[in-house]
């Protein structure tokens, strides 16, 4: 926001910019994005008469953390400390928020840097969690590689786990590990390899 936009509470420009990013995206990564961020943005899109953005998938790091790990807290800040990844910048407390409402340029600049830091933190946390996400987006679908590709991260650097199989009620499948994100995958062909891998659930 510019100082003038902050003072007049005019958020239309940044809502239009956000809509454009959503409309271009294939995948959005967010922490609590499914329950909060996406719906919050949708409300603003509706307010300004914008249509629903074109289809995209959401990878929610909060959902991954809740499903896979018995940690005392699941906030982005806690996960950053727990995983020893770069922590987002301090927003400066309530004074920064008050300054933003008053159109103070320094406060607005601080908030921009804080949010950029948030993105860096989220990116690093997602890198650490994506190998655990068995209900997530199939990244292999966005990859033109004809080799066996990891569904979690899109890497074709996968290795067979010798003598290890995944079983369904009627079949067994060769198991692989992605050397990029650590995900465990299986072939989609009975007792054999294949160029298409699926998640082991």
Protein language model annotation of sequence segments:
Residues 163-175:
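Short linker/helix segments within small regulatory modules
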Residues 148-153, 178-181:
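Short cysteine-rich clusters marking metal-coordination/redox-active sites
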Residues 144-147, 172-173:
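Flanking scaffold residues of small Cys/His-coordinated metal-binding clusters
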Residues 154-158, 182-185:
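Cys/His-rich microdomains that often coordinate metals
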Residues 29, 78-144:
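Acidic, Mg2+-coordinating catalytic module of metal-dependent nucleases/exonucleases
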Residues 159-165, 188-192:
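Short Cys/His-rich "knuckle" micro-motifs
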Residues 174-200:
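Short metal-binding segments enriched for Cys and/or His
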């Amino acid at each position: 926001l510019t100082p003038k936009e902050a003072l007049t509470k005019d958020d239309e420009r940044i809502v239009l910019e956000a809509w454009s990013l959503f409309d271009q995206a294939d995948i959005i990564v967010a922490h609590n994005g499914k329950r909060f961020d996406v719906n919050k943005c949708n409300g603003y899109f509706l307010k300004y008469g914008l249509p629903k953005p074109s289809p995209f998938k959401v990878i929610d790091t909060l959902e991954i953390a809740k499903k896979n790990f018995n940690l005392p807290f699941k906030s982005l800040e806690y996960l950053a400390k727990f995983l020893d990844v770069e922590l987002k910048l301090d927003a400066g407390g309530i004074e920064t928020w008050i300054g933003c409402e008053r159109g103070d340029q320094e406060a607005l600049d601080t908030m921009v840097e804080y949010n950029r830091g948030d993105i860096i933190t989220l990116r690093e946390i997602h890198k650490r969690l994506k190998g655990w996400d068995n209900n997530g987006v199939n990244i292999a679908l966005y990859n033109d590689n004809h080799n066996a590709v990891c569904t979690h991260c899109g890497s074709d650097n996968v290795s067979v786990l010798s003598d290890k199989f995944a079983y369904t009620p009627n079949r067994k499948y060769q198991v692989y590990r992605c050397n990029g994100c650590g995900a465990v995958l299986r072939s989609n062909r009975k007792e054999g390899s294949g160029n298409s891998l699926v998640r082991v659930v």
